[in-house]
Design a protein with these regions (language model features):
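Conserved AAA+ ATPase core "coupling" helix
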Residues: 1-46
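C-terminal engagement/docking regions of AAA+ P-loop ATPases
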Residues: 42-45, 51-130
Length: 130
């Protein structure tokens, strides 16, 4: 109704922006500056590689998905006040960043397997750098 439209318009007009373009670009640059040492990068890539040859997956993580995973690990490190990404960042983000990027085989899907469970098993199985 017109009354609801007016209410919505008033509510949206009262919402203050939380960031501007310059602020977003600045944070993106800060994320890219977070250091990812070679052992952590290789760890992340081993997890990605395991999705590409997993028997329950028709489609694993793409190169673009791997880059998103890498950037997410950098962003998590920054949010935790660190200038470097750690294996903990990689482990914490594997499922939330990668699960929707996987395509399960029909057999796995109908057998009750989930992308989350596959990623949990991969993360548990890939050796963590020390």
């Amino acid at each position: 109704s017109a009354h609801l439209d007016d209410q919505l318009r008033d509510t949206l007009a009262a919402v203050a922006p939380v960031a501007d373009v310059a602020g977003i670009l600045r944070v993106q640059a800060e994320v890219r500056d977070v250091d990812v040492k070679e052992p952590v990068a290789k760890y992340l890539l081993r997890i990605v590689a395991r999705t590409r040859d997993h028997r329950s997956l028709d489609l694993g993580v793409s190169p673009r998905g791997a880059l998103a995973f890498f950037r997410a690990a950098q962003a998590r490190a920054l949010l935790h006040g660190r200038a470097y990404a750690s294996p903990d960042d990689v482990q914490a983000l594997a499922r939330p960043v990668l699960a929707h990027r996987l395509q399960l085989t029909s057999q796995a899907r109908y057998g009750g397997t989930t992308a989350d469970s596959i990623l949990a098993a991969i993360v548990a199985d890939v050796a963590v750098p020390t």
